[in-house]
Regions:
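Active-site residues of response regulator receiver
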Residues: 8, 52
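Two-component/phosphorelay signaling modules centered on CheY-like receiver
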Residues: 11-29, 97
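Helix N-cap/capping motif at the beta->alpha junctions
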Residues: 30-39, 60
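Short amphipathic alpha-helix used as the core "switch/output" element in two-component signaling
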Residues: 39, 61-73
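Active-site beta3 strand of CheY-like receiver
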Residues: 44-50
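Alpha4 helix (beta4-alpha4-beta5 surface) of REC/receiver domains from two-component response regulators
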Residues: 62, 83-103, 110, 114
């Protein structure tokens, strides 16, 4: 069973995402921020990471940069609802840093599941 790490500071969103992903046969780990997510990944790597981009502390952009530097083959889906610049600017930057897929919040479940399946093939 593939393992997925969700990094997002929004507890409700993380819980909802976890339930949806688990219902589709995946094992899920959670972290409330980039710093915690990186620590968790270093201790027990997962097959895929789904990370929000706009978070307090170590944001998703910094998280992707650090993980890709140390683990170049890591598979990452970046998600964003926007912020001051708008979601497309953050998602474009995440893609440039190595995120294989980018999705805009609110997440469309079929689109997310398709991205997960493609990356875990």
């Amino acid at each position: 069973m593939a393992r997925i790490l969700i990094i997002d500071d929004d507890d409700q969103f993380r819980t909802m995402l976890r339930q949806l992903i688990e219902r589709n046969g995946y094992e899920v780990e959670e972290a409330p921020g980039g710093k915690e997510g990186i620590k968790l990944y270093r201790e027990n790597p997962t097959d895929l990471i789904i990370t929000d981009l706009i978070m307090p502390g170590k944001d998703g952009i910094e998280t992707i940069r650090e993980l890709k530097k140390d683990f170049p083959d890591i598979k990452i889906i970046a998600i964003s609802g926007g912020g001051r610049l708008g979601p497309q600017d953050y998602l474009h930057l995440a893609k440039m840093l190595g995120a294989q897929r980018t999705l805009t919040k609110p997440i469309q479940l079929p689109e997310l599941l398709k991205a997960i399946e493609e990356l875990l093939e």
